[in-house]
Amino acid sequence: MIRGRAPRTRPSPPPPLLPLLSLSLLLLSPTVRGDCGPPPDIPNARPILGRHSKFAEQSKVAYSCNNGFKQVPDKSNIVVCLENGQWSSHETFCEKSCVAPERLSFASLKKEYLNMNFFPVGTIVEYECRPGFRKQPPLPGKATCLEDLVWSPVAQFCKKKSCPNPKDLDNGHINIPTGILFGSEINFSCNPGYRLVGVSSTFCSVTGNTVDWDDEFPVCTEIHCPEPPKINNGIMRGESDSYTYSQVVTYSCDKGFILVGNASIYCTVSKSDVGQWSSPPPRCIEKSKVPTKKPTINVPSTGTPSTPQKPTTESVPNPGDQPTPQKPSTVKVSATQHVPVTKTTVRHPIRTSTDKGEPNTGGDRYIYGHTCLITLTVLHVMLSLIGYLT
């Protein structure tokens, strides 16, 4: 029996090589990428480059506006380096603009203008009164950006509100130096003999939608002195339940005693607003215990006598008479003792005659004259010598 041979199967042909080769070449070949050159010029702006001169793909460069220009809202200030080596498209984003509107002491911008930073020519902004101010209807609260990029002036269309008129301060005074409008300050003080309890000043400030004084007004309370001290051997007049400023009490002593010190003292106020008496109370001392002062006599060494002495008169003998010599008396005088100086008046006999030359028969006539004053200095020396010799 002859067996039949199985037919041989041919292997399947390999896949086409060209498409695979093409794909391999695409995967293995490097990608061609281009660098961007300097960023483009954009009107009214300048790029922020740093140290870079070439920029790789996807690099970004930002711009800032030149002086006098502002970035237009919602416009980008950035360009991007694309894969083709070109910069992304751009448009002018810097335009002329006024600076931010002026801040006013009496008004502020309305809310819709607070976040704006671009104000081209012709832009109008509106203000509203600040707290503490109220609007004056005839005046507008607007400003316009002018051609020369400055804002038109804004009239003072708001005026200050007024605080309530302060009432009188009992036993005190309210000083109002600048009025009672918003922002003003008033000061408080008390009359002598009263103490200020509370604030010494307050301001007119905003309270809700109106204005009012910051603090509650103070009060002036009367200052009292402590009870005056009593004294021994004496009494006090003017006692009361309380003692206020300038009130007086008077002391007197019992019989047989003498008052030493101020008879009256009064209630006064210290720098710290504390009541105190003007001085300590007096004392009463027994008369027998009061020291007596012995009189003192001052004897000056020089000077003229205080009481003139009566002149001494003696007769001068007629010519030819011999005076009887007198024994000098000795006087002891200390150098510091005051010795009165006497005046000596000598009577000189003068014989008078008639016009016919007749002699005087009626005795001698005497006249006062030739008064001799011995100076104190000479007398002092003489007396000292006499005392020394004896």
From Swiss-Prot:
Glycans are attached at N187, N262. Residues 273-362 are annotated as: Disordered. Disulfide bonds join C36-C81, C65-C94, C98-C145, C129-C158, C163-C204, C190-C220, C225-C267, C253-C284. It is found in: Cell membrane. Brain, secretory epithelia, skeletal muscle, liver, testes, thymus, spleen and lymph node. It is a lipid-anchor; GPI-anchor. One of its GO terms (biological process) is regulation of complement activation. Residues 363-390 form a propeptide. Residues 298-319, 327-344 have a biased composition (Polar residues). GO terms for cellular component: external side of plasma membrane. The first Sushi domain (SCR1) is not necessary for function. SCR2 and SCR4 provide the proper conformation for the active site on SCR3. This protein recognizes C4b and C3b fragments that condense with cell-surface hydroxyl or amino groups when nascent C4b and C3b are locally generated during C4 and c3 activation. Interaction of daf with cell-associated C4b and C3b polypeptides interferes with their ability to catalyze the conversion of C2 and factor B to enzymatically active C2a and Bb and thereby prevents the formation of C4b2a and C3bBb, the amplification convertases of the complement cascade. Belongs to the receptors of complement activation (RCA) family. This is Complement decay-accelerating factor, GPI-anchored. It comes from Mus musculus (Mouse). The lineage of its organism: Eukaryota, Metazoa, Chordata, Craniata, Vertebrata. The gene is Cd55.
